[in-house]
Amino acid sequence: MPSKPVENLSPVPAERRAEFAALPPLREAHAGAMASVAAFGEIESAAAPAGVEKSLLRVAAWNLERCLYPDAAARLLRQQGVDLVLLSEMDSGMLRTGQRHTTRDLAGFLGHGHAYALEFLELAPMPAPVAYDDPATDNRLGFHGNGFTSALPFRDPVVIRLDEVADWFIDPPGGQKRIGTRMAVAATFRCGDREFVGCSVHLESRADFAGRARQMRGLLDALDAYADSLPVLIGGDLNTKVAPGGHDNPEEMLFGEAAARGYDWSGCNLAGVTTRRSTWSSGLNPRQLDWFCTRGLVAEAPAVMPSVDEVGKVLSDHDAILLTLRL
C-alpha cells in the first residue's frame, strides 16, 4: 500500500490525455493507461501550520461535489470549529471549477494542512457553471480525487485503492470518461500525546450491495494493516441504498463488515437525509449516503451541516456530517 509523497501530483500532458480518450473501450486499455500515470501512485501533502492540544476534536466528512465554492465551504466549516475535514469529490485543474486546486484552496482558507490523491483522471472537459477569468477550453490537469484538510499534525498519508466494481472508461455514464478507480486516503493524526488513524473514503455510486461490501472489506483489510493497534475513524460518501438510519439493515452488508471488526456506527451518525438539489444534481431520490464509523474512539454529538451558505447558495449535493471525538 505504498504511496509516494509529493508536493504536487505529477501532471499528465494534454496530448497524453487525448490519447487515453481515443483508446478502445477495453479493460486492458484502461489498465495500461492507469499503470502509466505516475499520479495514481502518489499522494500530495502539506503539513499543518501548528499542532493542536485539546481533548475534544470536531471532525467533518463532506462530499463537496467538485468543490465549486471552497471559500464559502471554509466559512461554514469555521463556524463549526472543525479540526479535521475528510473530503471526497475534489477537483484540481478542472475547467468546471476554474482550474483550482480545491483541496489546497480549502485548506488555505481554513489555515489547515492537507493531503490529496487522485481517484480519476477526467478525459472530457465539462463547462463551468459560473464565470471565471480564464480563456481555457480544456482541463489543465483533469484531476478528481479525495483527501483531507487538518489542523492536526499528521504522518504517513497513504492511498488505498478499492476493488473495481463499476466501469467509468468502457461505458461512462453522462460522457464522464475517466481513468482510475475508487479509493480512500488515510493518515495518522496526532493530538497532544495521542494518535489515531483518520480515513476519507468514497465508495462506488454504481455498485450493488455486494460490490460496496467488497470495497469496504478491502478498505478494512488495508486499515488493519496500516493502523495496527491505533484507533480508527472512517468517514465519507458510502453511497448506501438503505433508509436513513439504516446502519442495522443487513441488506447493506458493508455495515456488518465493519461492525464485525469492532467498528461502531450507532454513536457516530444521525438518521437523516444527507443529499440535496445542487448546481449539478437534481436532488431526486434523497438518501443518507454519508457516514462515520469508529473503532477505539469515543464519538459524540453527531450532526448534519446543510451545504447552504449565508446567502442561500447551495455548495454541494451532499450535506456535511460532523461528530466530536473525545480523546
Where are these regions (language model features)?
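Stable alpha-helical elements in mature extracytoplasmic
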Residues: 69, 73, 102, 106, ...
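Active site of divalent-metal-dependent phosphoester/diester hydrolases
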Residues: 5, 113-150, 240-315
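Metal-dependent phosphoester/phosphodiester hydrolase catalytic core
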Residues: 155, 160, 180, 192-197, ...
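Mobile, glycine- and charge-enriched loop segments
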Residues: 2-67, 229-236
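Active-site beta-strand/loop signature of hydrolases that rely on acidic residues for catalysis
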Residues: 58-63, 73-99, 115-119, 149, ...
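Short, flexible loop segments at the rims of nucleotide/cofactor-binding pockets, characterized by
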Residues: 61-66, 92-93, 176, 208-210
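Structured beta-strand-rich core segments of catalytic domains in phosphoester-bond hydrolases
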Residues: 8-9, 16-44, 91-192
